[in-house]
Amino acid sequence: LIGCGTAYHSCLVTKYWLEEFTNLVIETDIASEFRYRNNRFDKNNLYIFVSQSGETADTFAALDLCKKENLKTCSVVNVVESSIARQSDCVLPIHAGPEIGVASTKAFLGQMLVLYLFSLKIGEVRGDLDNKKYKKLISNLKNLPQLIKETLKEEQKIQLIAKDIYNSKGSMFLCIGSSYPIALEGWSVYTSPSP
């Protein structure tokens, strides 16, 4: 799993999921660093590249390196006509639409949803995730739109909390497990300049 910034954070979350739902060992890399490592490429591996725009230069360069080694590649992108998508053997589109602000919140959630479904399916197909648990986790996803609606009803409370955080002298983002990369992304959004 290879990406930069927000996309890399979604790679980190996906590592937790794939290792939970399968017996696979998963590696993640920041795209800019991937090219400078002494990589031991394995033709049996799938190299997944995550990029909101599909044009991230470091991610494209890492993909290009894998293509030169005749490795299997897949991309998770928002723009299906992008360079990264065209160069990949398969594409998992996130269909999040264009980002309006500096923070890539829609794309991050879209990447995570697609990669969660991907992780579940890989676990099910490999037989590492039993069918009963697979169906339950898929069923839980169907509740997501309702949970989002309920959360959005709390807009006034959320605005008060946001104001308190904004006026505070400092903040800490504390998480463990698969929530750790979410904290990294939260910190990234929190410290991003407003448009």
Language-model-derived ranges and their functions:
Residues 1-143, 176, 188-193:
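Glycine-rich phosphate-binding loops that contact phosphosugars or nucleotide phosphates
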Residues 151-167:
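A short, well-structured juxtamembrane/interface segment
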Residues 166-187:
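Acidic catalytic cores of enzymes that act on phosphate-bearing nucleotides/polynucleotides
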